[in-house]
UniProtKB/Swiss-Prot annotation:
Its cofactor is Zn(2+). This is Small ribosomal subunit biogenesis GTPase RsgA. PROSITE patterns: ENGC_GTPASE, G_CP. It comes from Escherichia coli (strain SMS-3-5 / SECEC). One of its GO terms (cellular component) is cytoplasm. Its main location: cytoplasm. Belongs to the TRAFAC class YlqF/YawG GTPase family. RsgA subfamily.
């Protein structure tokens, strides 16, 4: 990170926000301000309960407490933090997070008990990793794409393990990927084993904060290892830093820096995006090629299934919309209805 001290105006706003929150809280201040130095900017590279690892402008990592006035803090957040003074070493903290800058984006996932939970912030793009083995699933890709469209975060589709394809297999896979290329999505074909195709992927990741999504077995960790230049497997629950704080077991998201530039957040929370909390209209909007036909159906309440005069079905029959995408659209709606039914049944049992 480049060194970027707070301006006087930013400092005044941070102080004003902090004081206002303290006044509206019935709790006393949680830490003595005299224990900490001047405010600086940083980025959260991981979060553990009421602690966070914050990377400062000079690249050092500091274990920090979090003010109770901060309601939400996740990996990727840009923050204002203060280092602990030398006299404060006895309290076993390196600093304290004082405030969180406004997010440009937030990656969330639904939770049956806690509603929609944020898991990472300021994401520029989501890299959807799929593979020909154990099975190339366009349905899973389509689910990820709906989530990306709903979150308004740019997706990139990466097909891994292409070294396992013969000429005929490569032709078939390219035909499948053309479905996505033809509707404007970027598709990259790579092999983490032979490193074929990694250069274009590196270029796509440079200067951006990305998060990788993919089911087990698609080689997501191997791909990250190759991009990060690591000799050992990434373990999301193996966290360490250069501040002498040792190892910590966690299931938290973690931010890493690519040697070629750019950052990646590795998180166990994005193996699969749940869509059950969305409305059917949001799923429909998540299929970008449907947009030109919405509002053209004969009936306003058209379900885009067997309804007469459905403009979307007519587009499928005319080859303007891929049939596999249309089928996956209905599979997603059916799976959503099933999950919501189970959730409602569970709620009535409580």
């Amino acid at each position: 990170m480049s060194k970027n001290k707070l301006s006087k105006g930013q400092q005044r706003r941070v102080n004003a926000n902090h004081q206002r929150r303290l006044k509206t809280s019935k709790e006393k201040p949680d830490y003595d301000d005299n224990l900490f130095g001047e405010p600086d900017e940083g980025i959260v590279i991981s979060r553990f309960g009421m602690h966070a690892d914050v990377e400062s402008a000079d690249g050092d990592v500091h274990r920090c407490n979090i003010r109770r006035t901060i309601r939400s803090l996740v990996t990727g957040d840009r923050v204002v933090w203060r280092p602990g003074k030398p006299a404060a070493e006895g309290v076993n903290v390196k600093g304290i997070v004082e405030a969180v800058h406004e997010r440009t984006s937030v990656l969330t996932r639904p939770d049956f008990y806690d509603g929609v939970k944020p898991i990472a912030a300021n994401i520029d793009q989501i890299v959807i990793v799929s593979a020909i083995l154990p099975e190339l699933s366009l349905n899973i890709i389509d689910r990820y794409l709906v989530a990306c469209e709903t979150l308004q975060i740019e997706p990139i589709i990466v097909l891994n393990k292409i070294d396992l394809l013969d000429d005929e297999g490569m032709k078939f896979v390219n035909e499948q990927m053309d479905i996505y290329r033809n509707i404007g999505y970027r598709v990259l074909m790579v092999s983490s084993h032979t490193q074929d195709g990694l250069k274009p992927l590196e270029e796509a990741l440079t200067g951006r904060i990305s998060i990788f999504a993919g089911q087990s077995g698609v080689g997501k960790s191997s791909l990250l290892n190759a991009l990060l230049g690591l000799q050992k497997e990434i373990l999301t629950n193996d966290v360490s830093d250069n501040s002498g704080l040792g190892q910590h077991t966690t299931t938290a998201a973690r931010l890493y820096h690519f040697p070629h530039g750019g950052d990646v957040i590795d998180s166990p929370g994005v193996r699969e995006f749940g869509l059950w909390h969305l409305e059917p209209e949001q799923i429909t909007q998540g299929f970008v090629e449907f947009h030109d036909y919405l509002g053209l159906c004969k009936y306003r309440d058209c379900k885009h299934d067997t309804d007469p005069g459905c403009a979307i079905r007519e587009a499928v029959e005319e080859g303007k919309i891929a049939e596999t995408r249309f089928e996956n659209y209905h599979r997603i709606l059916e799976s959503m209805a099933q999950v919501k039914t189970r959730k409602n049944f569970s709620d009535t049992d409580d």
